[in-house]
Amino acid sequence: MIATAAVYLALSATLFGPVDAHGARVEHVTVRSQAVDRELGVSVVVPARTKPRGERPLLVFLHGRGGSDETFIGNEAVFEGLEKMGRKAPIIAFPDGGDHSYWHDRREGDWGSYVMREVIPQVERRFGTDPHRVAIGGISMGGFGAYDLALLHPHRFCAVGGHSPALWFEGGETAPGAFDGVADFNRNDVVGMVRGNPDAFDGMRVWNDYGDADPFRVYDEGFVGHLRADGADLSAHTWSGGHDGAYWTRHWPAYLRFYANALASC
């Protein structure tokens, strides 16, 4: 069990980034994590027109394999999308999840617990976000992680989104290093958790999108099919493109509209 009192956000290491062209502020903070036994960065984007402390919605966004907390900070589409959301724009926390953690508790570290018990509570306290208005999303590996954490922590999130999420039907199909073995996969089998389970995402709005040339398309189609059969509150999209940065950059404005609207209504 994590000794929460011993886990803290290293505010002394906080760096205040310059205001970007769209008025948002980027703050880089460091979490000294007991869950994964290392220091990790969290990049936090504060929109220009944020709400008062205690009322601010929070989007936790998980990067893909090989990424970091700074993966999306240089993406103009993120800031353009936030500006268009006005007062509904959420604060976005981009935690560093390592190269191939797949955002779940495993032998090399409790990466899911790091997000749930360390990153989210500390960001809530530091930035004054509303603990009842939290969404989680991610791209590729991060999309898998967002679904997994939302399923394992029911009623914690208002909304969850997977953007080209890295999903599989069986443990033997997974990418090298994604899981510790079949037992680890079975504990975090996102597709299996929603199959025939209409309450899997109970109370959450769910988003899924992927490109028509995405190698994960068949798995995402299966996942979406289960959600539709079970009557989930689902927004699902198949767009032109592959599993790459150009595809995701084109759709950041749509992603942010989904999260902002879901957080405003939860």
List each language-model region with its residue ranges.
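Secretory targeting and sorting signals
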Residues: 1-14
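Non-catalytic cap/lid and distal C-terminal segments of serine-dependent acyl enzymes
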Residues: 12-266
